[in-house]
Amino acid sequence: MNTRPSSHRLFDVGAVGAWDLTASDLPVLQDFFVANPDYFLAVNGMPPRADEAKQEFEDRPPAEMPFDKIHVIGFFDSAGRLIAMASVISHLLAEGVWHIGLFIVASSLHGMGTAASLYAGLEGWMQQQGARWVRLGAVAGNARAERFWERRGFAEVRRREGLQLGKLVQTVRVFVKPVSTSGMQDYLSLVVRDRPESLLP
């Protein structure tokens, strides 16, 4: 299923439109996950669940991790096909910290520079919305993802070990990238849980 959503259009990346998805877009998002299972197989050791898209709209950070808003963003090409998605949390843990929970590009577009250009558009939009730093987690050993984020200018600040993700127990590298005049030390002074010595989950 491919159809442009009726929700709010956030920004464009060339001929690709980025839309703020809503619960009415669950079928097209679930179809996208099923057609592009690589992320779920690598991180969770299993294909996407039958309610994977639904969980993207319902999952929330723990109570001790305050946030402003969750955006589930769909990237649609000029033919109305969903070619990528991102889940973004604004002002997580502190003002100016934007967290990327998921960023998945259709497997058929891997190696073509599509992910890099879509991420650049996403980062620019986040900056316009007040992002000072972008934060995300990458599973240690998922070399493709690690290389991608490092090439985008992200640096590891800490590791979270022993996390149960689906069928697998993983170590997650917490990556941060300053996207304003505020640097990494400013970030670490503000977000205590991401300091290298932190024992917080």
Locations of regions flagged by a protein language model:
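Conserved acetyl-CoA-binding loop of GNAT-fold acetyltransferases
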Residues: 150-159
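Short hydrophobic/aromatic beta-strand or adjacent loop that forms the aromatic wall/cage
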Residues: 70, 170-174
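Short, solvent-exposed loop/turn elements at beta->coil junctions and helix N-caps
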Residues: 89, 160-164
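Conserved beta-strand-loop-alpha-helix junction that forms the acyl-donor binding cleft
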Residues: 136-146, 163-168
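Acetyl-CoA-dependent GNAT
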Residues: 4-110, 119-121, 125, 178, ...
